[in-house]
Amino acid sequence: MTSWVLIALSLFVVSAAMALRTNAWRGAIARVAARGGGDGSMVPITVLVPVRNGADELAALLQDLHAQGHPRALTEVIVVDDHSEEPVQRLVSSMARQWPQLRYLPMEEGAGKKAAIMAGVRAAQHELVLLTDADARCAPGRVAAVAAAFQAHPCDLLLLPVRTEGDGLCGMLQVEEQAALLAALVGTWSEGRPMLANGANLAFRRTAFEAVGGYLGDVRDSGDDVFLLQRMRRAGRTVEVAVDAALWVRVQAAPSCGEALTQRLRWAGKMGAVRDPVSGLVSLVALLLPWALTVFTVLAVADQRVGDGLLRTWTLLLAAWAAWCVPLVQVTGDVHRLAGEERPRPVRTFAALLAFTVYAPVIAVVSRLYRPRWKGRRIR
């Protein structure tokens, strides 16, 4: 066996292992999607909205929350104002005149989203807390579906789905990336090692949040979702996932590539603080695999000669490429279908995955060296 064949075989084995894992994720997504909810009609719930500026987006979200089908008397909504420079207080106060369950909570101590969430949890009247970003949109059945999911699958932390909407090349990349990340969220949860969460749609029990210390001691500004997940895991708390149609929230993609890059630098910075060696190693292999396939393909084209196991090398190499990309495209398509989006576009998904393999390692490195500004503040 020549060195060419041996390397191609090694790459195929790794790709096949990744394909098996991704196919297992597809099965997990199907099982989670098939689960039903319980009767949450009498479950009280607090919806927590930390906000800094973005009054127009907040107004749209509050309209969605006001239209919820869950009993209004059981649905408390708290808007925690993180020192906004826009008229957030005026907006909330005007709506609260006709909506007594809506509360405005200005932050008196500290700053940042984590401090805002902790202030909101302290003020919450109910045990079940639903966290949502101020720029998210949701369907009228969202709150009721969250309550039903907690009834059917009792847990301390509930991971919920987020769909990104966007136009143009940059928007398309973000849409596909978010779908792939949601697949990874459900997949790693099914493996017993959940790594991802999204603060735009997250629910937890107030007593569990307080028991793990909330965000006490966290020095990073971002990462409220992932750090809470890691704290819950370390404390042995129960983590569940639900993806029912009514649970989805929609967020707009960053309008420009520059803003999308800044957003990803912020996200990558928080992932560097996650302490899970096994999952980290597997993620590193998954990130580097397409690079290894690309480098070996280029070398094979440039240097391999007839007689060096040419046929076997290229058979294994093509199989490795297929084992890497086909399951990823399929699982991303599964998420698109769950989100009720238009018919999945495998070519578009494949192109976005290729782009992700190029920019993800670069962002991971740059995020260690550079902290972007977010909402007027330098991220720590």
List the predicted regions and their residue ranges:
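Acidic donor-binding/catalytic loop of UDP-sugar-dependent glycosyltransferases
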Residues: E86-P87, A134-A149
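Membrane-embedded multi-pass helical conduit in multi-pass membrane proteins
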Residues: I7, N23, V282-Y370
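Short aromatic/hydrophobic "clamp" motif used to bind/position activated sugar donors
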Residues: V129
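Catalytic donor/gating beta->alpha subdomain of glycosyltransferases that bind UDP-sugars
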Residues: F150-H153, L157-L182, E210, L216-S279
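Short, acidic, metal-binding catalytic loop of nucleotide-sugar glycosyltransferases
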Residues: Q63-L74
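N-terminal membrane-anchoring/stem segments of glycan-assembly enzymes
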Residues: M1-D39, A184, L353
